[in-house]
Amino acid sequence: MKVVTFGELMVRLQPFNYERFVQANNLEFSFGGGEANVAVSLANYGLDAAFVTKLPAHAIGQAAVNSLRRYGVDTSMITRGGDRVGIYYNEKGASQRGSVCIYDRANSAIQLAQPSDFDWDKIFEGVDWFHFTGITPALGQNVVEICLEACKAAKAHGVKISCDLNYRGKLWTREQARAAMTELCQYVDVCISNEEDAKDVFGIEAEATDIYGGKLNAEGYKSVAKQLADKFHFEKVAITLRESHSAFDNGWSAMLYDVASNEYCFSKKYDLHIIDRVGGGDSFGGGLIYSLLTGKSTQEAVEFAVAASALKHSIEGDYNMMTVAEVEKLAGGDGSGRIQR
């Protein structure tokens, strides 16, 4: 099975030891980005995963490419050119202080990319699945056009398409997001959202839910999933459910709605003590794609995806370093965290 993901791979700069930006003297250097994170997860699970983007040909661009190669991601379809690698600064939250993300992505290679930079017919030869997120079209209208061309080509090649809505208010307005994502979602088969994105992008929300007070009405998300599926004719809708008690402690679960069977499956809920939550949603997406490609049932798929994401919250950095066996062990009920000897 081969999966292609498309998006921006950025430099991640982060203060050490939960320091704030204003007190930090040093920053930790790594790489990450929503769709790249999904590709790493899938490569770790043994699938043929390729990441498509545009990166400069200089040393930082090459370091970004190498960060994917080391985990087995196919980087052969990355276009090289431009001058900048996008940057995001991440200040990790602690206790009641939430994390802060500051973007420095203007004029990055992918933000300035043009549709002619990518040969989607060639890229989708022999591909089974295509994944992108709502973060990528938020980079500009030219990138919306690239995403549209990718989706049209994927459909022409019989490729399944998944999209994580991933609304980012620092990149575009709700009105801009709704216009672009309404057009793009017409091509999507599997939609991934969270407790906020459906409301932010499409104005669809669950009743009796207070995301900031840690109160979620899980049953209300059946209606959210149904409305999304009806609007865009999705085959499946997954919604992750995060109960945020503090920066360290979250409740984490998800629901997967299968339209054909009219089946709503809820995962077990995990009580997380978080090491790093960045990439948590991407690891859910990677787990879900893996599950659907390998024939898991709706219940098995949502359990695997949530377990994969729960484990990612214990790992520093954007990328999820877990194996299929480790995820299946947790999904099967072993969450003791006991030492392996």
Identify what each model region corresponds to.
Residues 264-334:
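Conserved post-catalytic alpha-helical subdomain immediately downstream of the catalytic base
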Residues 1-20:
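Positively charged, low-complexity intrinsically disordered leader regions
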Residues 155-160, 232-235:
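A short helix->loop->beta-strand "cap" motif at the edges of active sites that frequently abuts
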Residues 48-137, 327-341:
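Conserved N-terminal subdomain of the carbohydrate kinase-like
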